[in-house]
């Protein structure tokens, strides 16, 4: 009989979805010479807030 092991899912990883607007802006980011600036027009689907669509 093999020994039983216990798995702790909360160690190192927490399942779930973060709200997008909490992760899309990084104020401490510093631009680099290799960064590319792009402008895109995004039209959200019905029921999606504009800031979530971009």
UniProtKB/Swiss-Prot annotation:
Keywords: Acetylation, Calvin cycle, Carbon dioxide fixation, Chloroplast, Lyase, Methylation, Monooxygenase, Oxidoreductase, Photorespiration, Photosynthesis, Plastid
Biological process per Gene Ontology, one example term: reductive pentose-phosphate cycle
Catalysed reactions listed for this entry: 2 (2R)-3-phosphoglycerate + 2 H(+) = D-ribulose 1,5-bisphosphate + CO2 + H2O; D-ribulose 1,5-bisphosphate + O2 = 2-phosphoglycolate + (2R)-3-phosphoglycerate + 2 H(+)
EC number: 4.1.1.39
Enzyme class: lyase
Annotated GO CC locations: chloroplast
Domain of life: Eukaryota
Keyword Manganese: no
InterPro entries for this protein: RuBisCO (IPR033966), RuBisCO_lsu_N_sf (IPR036422)
Subcellular location: Plastid, Chloroplast
Residue numbers bearing the N-acetylproline modification: 3
Gene Ontology molecular functions: monooxygenase activity; ribulose-bisphosphate carboxylase activity
Additional facts recorded: The basic functional RuBisCO is composed of a large chain homodimer in a 'head-to-tail' conformation. In form I RuBisCO this homodimer is arranged in a barrel-like tetramer with the small subunits forming a tetrameric 'cap' on each end of the 'barrel'.
Function: RuBisCO catalyzes two reactions: the carboxylation of D-ribulose 1,5-bisphosphate, the primary event in carbon dioxide fixation, as well as the oxidative fragmentation of the pentose substrate in the photorespiration process. Both reactions occur simultaneously and in competition at the same active site.
Quaternary organization: Heterohexadecamer of 8 large chains and 8 small chains.
Protein's name according to its UniProt entry: Ribulose bisphosphate carboxylase large chain
């Amino acid at each position: 009989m093999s020994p039983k092991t216990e798995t702790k899912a909360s160690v190192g990883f927490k399942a779930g979805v973060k709200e997008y607007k909490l992760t899309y802006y990084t104020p401490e980011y510093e631009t680099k010479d290799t960064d590319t600036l792009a402008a895109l027009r995004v039209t959200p689907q019905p029921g999606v807030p504009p800031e979530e669509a971009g």
